[in-house]
Amino acid sequence: KRDKGAEQTDLLRRFRHLVELHYRDHWQVVKYANELGIDYDRLHRICKRETGRSPAELVHERLTAEAKARLENSGFPLKRIAQDLGFSDASRFSHFFKRRTDMSPGAYRAIVSRPDGEDLVELRRGFADWP
């Protein structure tokens, strides 16, 4: 008989793989569970036990990480990023992103696209900078 811990670790690995393949498709957690051949409650218990987070939180973390990467590394308009990430429109994407990060996608992009520390120049001045 297989070790229960190893089985749970394998299910979590398979879940993460499915998330990687389908996070842009906005699957419901029950669909991931069905694909894994288990029920929603078992998937939820395994994720909480192994990661401290629910399956939905793990999916949203992956989607948020991809959104941040695209905002940081592409000049694409929000509408395009929203479409690429499976949102029906830029407004829904903005709402999701703001709920997850406490800032709008535009504000996030403005912060991460500044040259390093540009906004901190005034704060760094010390006695040596005096005339």
Go through each PLM region and give its residues:
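Short, Lys/Arg-enriched, Trp-marked, Pro/Gly-tolerant hinge/linker segments that flank
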Residues: 1-17, 21-36, 49-55, 61
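The alpha-helix within a helix-turn-helix
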Residues: 33, 82-83, 94
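Core residues of bacterial helix-turn-helix
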Residues: 36, 85-86, 97
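Basic, low-complexity segments
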Residues: 36-42
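Short hydrophobic/aromatic patch on the recognition helix
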Residues: 43, 92-97
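Terminal helix-turn-helix DNA-binding modules in bacterial transcription factors
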Residues: 49-90, 107-131
